[in-house]
């Protein structure tokens, strides 16, 4: 029997796995998709929020401030792209200045470090590209930008290195109470566990109701984004917010850790995991963003995408043992600031185990730390040394991002190997540039096929069913599709 079964390996599930892997526990992660970080974690604003927005006294407020501090340390330790650039919440008119005062007071009460109110002149001195109508801003220096999928992947990889078992393409279809724990049914067999951690993201309500009575309702909310070329990457230096409202933190404009500019999201209620982009939604995002930063050149957009966040009717994170289901631990409703809070949320799990006297002393032989090769960032002499040891690093496959064959092979041979073209992209950035894989995609597909020993026709773009190739056209194999 497992000590702990974690359902879901987005950033919250990965953080829970990383935290629990520090202890001599038998832990398994059951992920429904074929890769980690393949839901909300891969499609969000990539912001580690400072923590001034959540209502004081909520779990969100406490865990946001704790989590962003923990995330900074984890990113440094695990070689995750991270930049503490700070954020500005703008008052775009005199009428919005009182709202900044409220956010400031809330931030002070939440323990957000270093926040202060700026005049219009101070704000424009920091960000000259802002709209001239700016009346002031709230500056939060602890806010940061991160690569969210790399954050989750790094924590999951180190957890696996330290004994956590990861089962991909293993959705949980039923949960039953058994003596001493829980029985989880999946298409790949059953798992018995003393504790279950429900980190299933958009599916957390359904998973909860397999084990306990209905106590919360998730409200899936789609957010649409523009990702702009690196030519727009220096448009702003901080994360730029507008005053938040009942729909969230509003449309932001932010640099990314990879040098692009990110603009979005809107907030549209949807049924389930509907990640379609719409003309109306994107038009709204562009118009709203221009209120803050009027000079954005949306013609430099290289990709639109949408993510669905798990808003919840409780107004706060759902964390703790479910009523009437001892040992079943919910980590649900992880809307913003879920990414920021994830490392602190994970520590809530160990607190629950400790309260039951089920948390042993930490391992003394823990294997922490992680690095990966970023060839283009190396000085010339290190590049030469690397190529001499492994010529694959001398063959550039993705010209937009200068990603080498060696880096792609690393992604396919890592502790959690990529199994799709997008999986490679999330691990080493191949296909992340201006052409969005138009040039390197076929070569990446070829490397996946050769390295993993699978038919090119079976190579996926991302999730199950996203086969890139339908048939061979010149060898007589023919197409059987309609």
Tell me what each language-model feature is.
Residues 138-195:
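Helical element adjacent to the flavin cofactor pocket in flavoenzyme catalytic cores
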Residues 15, 175-180, 184-264, 268-278, ...:
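Flavin-dependent oxidoreductases
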Residues 2-28:
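N-terminal Rossmann-like FAD-binding beta1-loop-alpha1 element of flavoenzymes
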Residues 404-414, 438-456:
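Iron-sulfur (Fe-S) cluster-binding segments and ferredoxin-like electron-carrier domains
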């Amino acid at each position: 029997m497992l000590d702990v079964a974690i359902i879901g390996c987005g950033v919250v599930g990965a953080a829970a796995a990383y935290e629990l892997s520090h202890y001599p526990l038998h832990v398994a992660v059951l992920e429904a998709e074929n890769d980690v970080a393949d839901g909300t974690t891969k499609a969000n604003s990539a912001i580690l929020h400072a923590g001034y927005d959540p209502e004081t006294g909520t779990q969100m407020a406490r865990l946001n401030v704790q989590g962003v501090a923990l995330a900074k340390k984890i990113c440094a330790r695990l070689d995750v792209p991270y930049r503490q650039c700070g954020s500005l919440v703008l008052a775009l008119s005199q009428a919005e200045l009182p709202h900044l005062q409220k956010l400031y007071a809330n931030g002070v009460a939440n323990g957000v470090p270093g926040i202060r109110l700026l005049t219009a002149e101070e704000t424009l001195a920091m960000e000259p590209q802002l709209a001239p109508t700016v009346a002031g801003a709230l500056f939060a220096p602890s806010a940061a930008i991160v690569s969210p999928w790399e954050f989750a992947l790094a924590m999951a990889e180190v957890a696996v290195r330290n004994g956590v078992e990861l089962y991909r393409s293993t959705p949980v279809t039923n949960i039953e109470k058994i003596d001493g724990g829980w029985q989880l049914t999946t298409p790949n067999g059953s798992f018995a566990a003393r504790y279950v951690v429900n980190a299933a993201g958009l599916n957390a309500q359904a998973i909860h109701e397999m084990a306990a009575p209905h106590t919360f309702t998730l409200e899936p909310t789609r957010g649409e984004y523009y990702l702009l070329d690196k030519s727009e990457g220096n448009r702003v230096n901080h994360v730029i917010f507008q005053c938040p409202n009942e729909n969230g933190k509003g449309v932001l404009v932010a640099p990314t850790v990879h040098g692009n500019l990110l603009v979005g999201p809107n907030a549209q209620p949807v049924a389930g995991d509907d990640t379609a982009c719409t003309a109306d939604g994107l038009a709204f995002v562009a118009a709203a963003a221009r209120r803050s930063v009027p000079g954005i050149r949306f013609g430099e957009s290289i990709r639109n995408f949408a993510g669905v966040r798990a808003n919840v009717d409780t107004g706060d994170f759902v964390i703790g043992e479910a009523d009437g289901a001892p040992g079943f631990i919910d980590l649900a409703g992880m809307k913003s600031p879920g990414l920021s809070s994830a490392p602190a949320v994970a520590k809530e799990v160990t607190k629950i185990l400790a309260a039951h006297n089920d948390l042993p002393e930490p391992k003394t032989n823990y294997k922490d730390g992680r690095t990966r090769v970023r060839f283009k960032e190396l000085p010339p002499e290190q590049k030469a040394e690397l190529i001499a040891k492994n010529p694959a690093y001398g063959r550039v496959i993705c010209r937009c991002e200068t990603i080498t064959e060696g880096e792609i092979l690393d992604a396919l041979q890592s502790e959690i190997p990529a199994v799709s073209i997008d999986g490679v992209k999330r691990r080493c950035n191949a296909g992340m540039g201006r052409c969005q894989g138009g040039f390197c995609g076929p070569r990446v597909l070829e490397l996946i096929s050769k390295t993993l020993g699978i038919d090119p026709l079976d190579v996926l773009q991302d999730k199950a069913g996203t086969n890139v190739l339908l048939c061979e056209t010149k060898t007589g194999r023919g197409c059987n599709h309609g």
